[in-house]
Amino acid sequence: MSVSFRDRVLKLYLLGFDPSEIAQTLSLDVKRKVTEEEVLHVLAEARELLSALPSLEDIRAEVGQALERARIFQKDLLAIYQNMLRNYNAMMEGLTEHPDGTPVIGVRPADIAAMADRIMKIDQERITALLNSLKVLGHVGSTTAGALPSATELVSVEELVAEVVDEAPKT
C-alpha cells in the first residue's frame, strides 16, 4: 500500500521537519521537484481540517454531560425499582393500599429482576464510558502535554464506583 503525498508531508512535518526540508526530502523520493509552496498548501489544508474539529475541552464537556444524563436516568430507574419493591412487599403482605393511602400495584418478581439488571447495566456502561474517555483523553493529553489524566479525573472514577455501590439495590 503506497503512502500518499499528503500523508508523507504530514508525517515529515510531525517529525519536526520544516517545509523547505520536506520539499527537499520528497523531491528525492518522488523523482520530481517538490516546491515549498506545495508543502505549505498541504499543511494549510491540514490546519483547516483540524480547526473544524472540536477542542479537547469540548469533548470533555460532552462526555461529562452524557455521563450526567446517564446518572440522572439511572437514579430515575432506581426510584422506580424501589417503588416496585415497595409494591411487591406490600402485595406479599396482602395489603391493597400503602400506609400513605396509595394503592398497591401488582408487580412480578421478573419485572423487578429485569429492572435491577437494567440499572446494573447502566452502571457498567457509565463506568466503561468514563474509563474509555479517560484513556482517550489521557492518550491525547500524553501526546500533547506529556501527561496522563490528572489525579482529579482518576478520583472521579473512584467516586463514580462508590456512588454506584451506594446506589445499588439492597435486597
Swiss-Prot record:
Pfam family, one: TerS_C
Cited InterPro entries: TerS_C, TerS_N
Keyword line: DNA-binding, Viral genome packaging, Viral release from host cell
GO MF annotation, one: DNA binding
Keyword Amino-acid biosynthesis applies: no
Summary of the function given for this chain in its UniProt record: The terminase small subunit binds to the packaging initiation site and regulates the ATPase activity of the terminase large subunit. The terminase lies at a unique vertex of the procapsid and is composed of two subunits, a small terminase subunit involved in viral DNA recognition (packaging sequence), and a large terminase subunit. Both terminase subunits heterooligomerize and are docked on the portal protein to form the packaging machine.
Membership in a protein family: Belongs to the P23virus small terminase family.
Assembly, per entry: Homononamer; forms a ring-like structure through which genomic DNA is translocated into the capsid. Heterodimer with the terminase large subunit; the active complex is probably heterooligomeric.
Name by which UniProt lists this protein: Terminase, small subunit
Organism annotation: Thermus phage G20c
